[in-house]
Amino acid sequence: MSALTSNFAPHIQAMPGWRTSLGHSPRDMKSAMTSFDRFCSSHHPGETVLTRQLATAWCQDTATGTWSAHRSRAVRELGKYLQLIGAEGFIVPSAWIARPTRGLPHMFTDEELAAFFQATDSIGADYRSPFREYTIPVIFRLILGAGLRPPEARRLRRHDVDADNAMVAIERSKRNKDRRVPVSGDLAGLLARFDHLADLRRPGREWFFEAQPGRQYSPAWLIASYHRCCELAGGIAPASTPYTLRHNYATRTLMRWAEEGKDLGAWLPYLAAYMGHQKYSPAAWYVHLLPERLAATGLTSVAGIIPAVTS
């Protein structure tokens, strides 16, 4: 965390350790807390107590007059931490924080996916992004083929990928949970060939996808590469993100199971575990993306085929 200068700096620096112990990423509040520190230093340099007035002043975006849910979630966590250690601190009520609305992700057609991966395979070499001509086709196939979160794919270390046994180890992902993800034989073969080429280029590298010695690719690089491929594919899915590939893995898996006549209610927990969901409901949400396709199979007439999503 960059240099902090407000009176809250010691607490802001200590809070990530507490959140990590609860299974949260130490990075998830970093940007917001750094911004809060600057706000306090600039506008409330003498303040030593997280009061209701201070918390609401920061949560209110003065430029737009709107209430920031992102800021309120962060300062709520700071208030909880302060009270936990016996300090005075206002906890922003959860009722003040609007729940984010979840838009429907783009569902790629087979033709769009073929065009997308044709675009990934057409990316040429560039001295500014060494090895991208191999990394881009493989990392996006991995996200789609194994349903990984984009950060999970970026952060893979070389020892996490066991191509011989077609297994990928995801370490300390969301809420610091670990899991092992089986992959198809074709995908395992692709990962093995990529690893061999990358090892010839940079023996003993740390990251499976390594941008520079000892450095993984950045989120911005992955997003920019994804959008470039969408554009090269004819401008498909302009509002989508790399996460859209993960969503498509889930929906295509569900469709395959439905067409095979499997009981989705019984199989959804397996999908949830495979994709690293702590709860059942996120996986069940994917069922609601497929009403027309499921109806076409005739399976929606079976009682209980679409479980209720309560959260």
Please report, for each region that a protein language model flagged, where it lies by residue.
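Conserved catalytic core of the tyrosine transesterase superfamily
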Residues: 1-311
